[in-house]
């Protein structure tokens, strides 16, 4: 069992010159969600003999920009925006400000180890994601996705040795 809680205040990882923010190739290097969020992760793993199961659950909230003509403020979630421009306020800044969005991700996987030498596994997987903002806009809207997958995987060249 593992549990992890992360909280990042608005405007963290951003800069007044967006080219000097804490990002690379349009990705945040500090955290995949950028700034202005809080999340709780829980991971459980089980194996008995050659059977195994993994469960990963993520629950969080993130404050996004509205990006509308009536409200084009920078609420601190996008690290590629200048944190000095279009701030709605300088004091009373809270995590989740802006278009507060609830996020839920569940990833469940189970399988059977066919060959331990090559780590060949037969597996099945279920992934569910729910993205639920307080207000739907053209760029941010309520969406749920579900994936089922199954297959065979292997580490053909498993050259990790402990001496």
For the regions a language model picked out, list residue spans one by one.
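Exposed, low-structure sequence patches enriched in small/polar residues
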Residues: 1-163
């Amino acid at each position: 069992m593992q549990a992890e809680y992360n909280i990042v205040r608005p405007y963290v990882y951003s800069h007044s010159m967006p080219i000097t923010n804490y990002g690379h190739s349009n990705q945040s290097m500090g955290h995949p969600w950028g700034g202005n969020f809080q999340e709780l992760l829980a991971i459980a793993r089980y194996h008995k003999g050659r059977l195994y199961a993994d469960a990963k659950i993520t629950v969080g909230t993130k404050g996004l920009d509205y990006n509308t003509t009536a409200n084009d403020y920078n609420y601190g979630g996008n690290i590629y925006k200048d944190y000095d421009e279009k701030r709605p306020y300088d004091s009373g800044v809270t995590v989740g400000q802006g278009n507060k969005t609830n996020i839920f991700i569940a990833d469940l996987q189970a399988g059977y180890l066919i060959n331990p030498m090559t780590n060949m596994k037969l597996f099945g997987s279920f992934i569910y994601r729910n993205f639920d903002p307080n207000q739907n806009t053209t760029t941010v809207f309520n969406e749920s996705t579900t994936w089922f997958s199954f297959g065979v995987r292997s580490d053909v060249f498993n050259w990790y040795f402990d001496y």
